[in-house]
Amino acid sequence: MIIDCHCHAGHGDGFTGPWDTNAPLKRYLKWAEEAGIDRTVLLAAFHSDYSVANAEVAKMMVQSRGRFYGFVFIHARHDQGNIFNIVKKAVNQQGFVGIKVHQHDARITREICEAARVFKLPVLYDVTGEVSICELLAQEYPDVNFIIPHLGSFADDWKAQLALIDHLVRHPNMYTDTAGVRRFDLLEQAVQRAGPDKILFGSDGPWLHPGVELEKIFLLGLSAQDEKKILSGNFLRLIKSVNQVQRSKNSVISKKPGMISSDYSSLRHEYRDRRVIGRY
């Protein structure tokens, strides 16, 4: 199985570029089918109200009948004070299996990390080249898995990408994806130093061709076992923990796969940031 772990979808409302205007999937799906990609993780386009954008992605997930996974997009500043409830709805009602945060909106916060900890979700955080935050995240939230896309920099900041490789090597909960990584030598170095267990295949579709991005993985010349980890195994391992919450002792398993009970009384004690817990 091949899973593209990084593809945007739906409409934005910013009109400053494709990333916040529209991310149509028609051509992407054709390209993905031709490339042999089986499933895709959808992320909303940039939006001033992610509740709208996430709802559009959730609808696509339902209509796809299992073709799409989804990561709920969180705006660290606009959603402040309500993030626990947003994530609760995203997991329980909409079927999301991870959280997406972009530094373009605002820097990641404890509130986001605490929600990820409770629901055992991976966090895809685009640091836009400022990879030093990985050190703090690894220290403060060693039990939360973070995926830093683009090997740390979509803008090809080679210094940032080299620094991220160091974080991948040193921190068990730090991962990256291959979306838009143009320095193939650095991608090779990431696999060699950090190992194939820390890398996820992603395309940054629908704007980048998923077949072209996938070919980079094949060109790494890995064993079938290591290639499988990058193409699907690592992602499936990272989202498997969502089911552990679903099967927690005091929760009732939902009838819909991938969703967890609406009874969160047993989880609330895990939400450790006392500055925000009182609001829920």
Where are these regions (language model features)?
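Alpha-helical elements of Rossmann-like donor-binding domains used by nucleotide-donor carbohydrate transfer enzymes
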Residues: 27, 56-59, 86-89, 111, ...
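Active-site gating/metal-coordination segments in enzymes
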Residues: 39, 47-124, 170, 174
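Mobile, glycine- and charge-enriched loop segments
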Residues: 1-18, 58-62, 66-73
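Catalytic pocket-lining loop regions of alpha/beta-barrel enzymes
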Residues: 105-200, 246, 253-254, 279
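Alpha-helical scaffolding within the catalytic cores
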Residues: 23-28, 51-60, 84-85, 131-135, ...
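Active-site beta-loop-alpha junctions enriched in small/polar residues
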Residues: 8-12, 45-46, 73-77, 102-104, ...
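Mid-to-C-terminal alpha-helical segments outside catalytic/metal-binding sites
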Residues: 1-5, 9, 21-39, 198, ...
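Hydrophobic faces of well-ordered beta-strands that scaffold small-molecule active sites
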Residues: 3-7, 40-42, 70-72, 97-101, ...
